[in-house]
Curated annotation (Swiss-Prot):
Superkingdom of the source species: Bacteria
Subunit: Homodimer.
Official protein name in the record: Ditrans,polycis-undecaprenyl-diphosphate synthase ((2E,6E)-farnesyl-diphosphate specific)
SUPFAM superfamilies to which the protein is assigned, alphabetical: Undecaprenyl diphosphate synthase
HAMAP family membership: ISPT
PROSITE patterns for the chain: UPP_SYNTHASE
């Protein structure tokens, strides 16, 4: 990360507080260059660094990145192994810089399937940055939106089984309290790179009223200009949340 400076000169005052990004296109980017897919994933790490720096510089409250879905285990073993090793190396190389710049790192998803080595890196990184109060950086790893909802439902079912909760008392609020990111500001904007127009099982609960922004730019080519363009496009949207009157939900 580069040093964080406050700079909102080129952005609308109606910028989102919480942005989530589906980082798509690493494989195609590598293929276009005649390289193996892992080459694209390595290049994508640089885009992560740029995105985090931009988010912190422009005072976003939270940035959530879709790094590895629960469906990605179906990819070739060689690619999965390379991704896991890249994850370890990225944590080792980036966490001190994140901490220096007051970023709080959280990994959301079912990390139990990861190697003990990777789980230890995750715990160590989260612990180091736990007390930081700057940008909240969430990395979704072995994450799926359906999994997230199911694990929340299971917590409620356990409460019902123990007699601590009546089924009739189950509400959106009670389920939300067990869903990932519930303690953070709601997701305002979802950006997907790579040209596909779908959500891919990402934050299904959390993005109910988020604005969606799709770009053909492949993730390794994602830079500050593309990010700024997405935020400025967001500023032109009228968010109604099911009503008829536009609501400025980004106001703190």
């Amino acid at each position: 990360m580069s040093p964080v400076k406050e700079d909102r000169a080129n952005l609308s005052p109606r910028s989102p507080r919480h942005v989530a990004i589906i980082m798509d296109g690493n494989g195609r980017w590598a293929k276009n260059k005649g390289k193996l897919r892992v080459f694209g994933h390595k290049a994508g790490v640089k885009s992560v660094r740029r995105a985090v720096s931009f988010a912190a510089k422009h005072n976003l409250d939270a940035l959530t990145l879709y790094a590895f879905s629960s469906e990605n285990w179906n990819r070739p073993d060689q690619e999965v192994t390379a991704l896991m090793e890249l994850f370890v190396r990225a944590l080792d190389s980036e966490v001190k810089s994140l901490h220096k710049h007051n970023v709080r790192l959280s990994i959301i998803g079912d990390i139990s399937r990861f190697s003990g080595r990777l789980q230890e890196r995750i715990r160590r990184s989260e612990k180091l940055t736990a007390n930081n109060d700057g940008l909240k950086l969430n990395i979704a790893a072995n994450y799926g939106g359906r999994w997230d909802i199911i694990q929340g439902v299971r917590h409620l079912a356990e409460q019902v089984q123990k007699g601590e909760l009546q089924p009739t008392d189950i509400s959106e609020e009670s389920l939300n309290s067990y869903i990932c990111l519930h303690e953070q500001s709601q997701v305002d904007l979802v950006i997907r790179t790579g040209g596909e127009h779908r959500i891919s099982n990402f934050l299904l609960w959390q993005i109910a009223y988020a604005e969606l922004y799709f770009t053909d730019v492949l993730w390794p080519d994602f830079d500050e200009n593309v990010f700024e363009g997405a935020l400025n496009a967001f500023a032109q949207r009228e968010r109604r949340f099911g009503g008829t009157t536009p609501i400025d939900a980004t106001a703190s």
